[in-house]
A protein has these predicted regions:
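Short beta-strand His + acidic residue motifs that chelate non-heme Fe in jelly-roll/DSBH
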Residues: 38, 57-58, 76, 82-89
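A short hydrophobic beta-strand segment most commonly corresponding to one strand
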Residues: 47, 90-105
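Short acidic-glycine-tyrosine-enriched beta hairpin
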Residues: 62-78
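Short, conserved beta-strand element in jelly-roll/cupin
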Residues: 30, 42-57, 97
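Short strand-connecting beta-turns/loops that link adjacent beta-strands
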Residues: 21-22, 43, 62, 89-90
């Protein structure tokens, strides 16, 4: 089942584990060819833990590429544009902790 994300992109699945006023924990599933497009958050840090993969988290300014195998993690601080996808367009599944702060999704072209 495809689901619409809050950033208006389609992903294979989203399970909300916990959500409060300034913290969210979710499990996201990306099917082959899907991604979380380039965006940033004004106030929150995204902390990723790969559950199934490999997966890739790319950032701009600083330009980095994090290749994560299951069990590995990385964090992207506020105001850092990032893009998430499975390696070579493959499927992946990850836990994401978003906070502490008010959630927003600012697309980046």
């Amino acid at each position: 089942m495809q689901v619409r994300s809050r950033g208006d992109y389609e992903i294979a699945g989203r399970e909300i584990v916990a959500e409060g006023a300034d913290l969210r924990v979710s499990v996201l599933t990306l099917a082959e060819g899907q991604c979380v497009p380039w965006h940033y958050h004004s106030a929150i840090t995204d902390s990723f833990v790969c559950l199934e993969g490999p997966m890739v988290v790319e950032t701009r300014a600083p330009r980095r590429l994090y290749r994560l195998e299951p069990g590995e993690r990385c964090a992207v601080p506020p105001k850092t544009a990032h893009y998430v996808h499975g390696e070579d367009g493959g499927a992946c599944k990850f836990l994401i902790v978003q906070g502490v702060g008010i959630y927003d999704f600012v697309p980046v072209g």
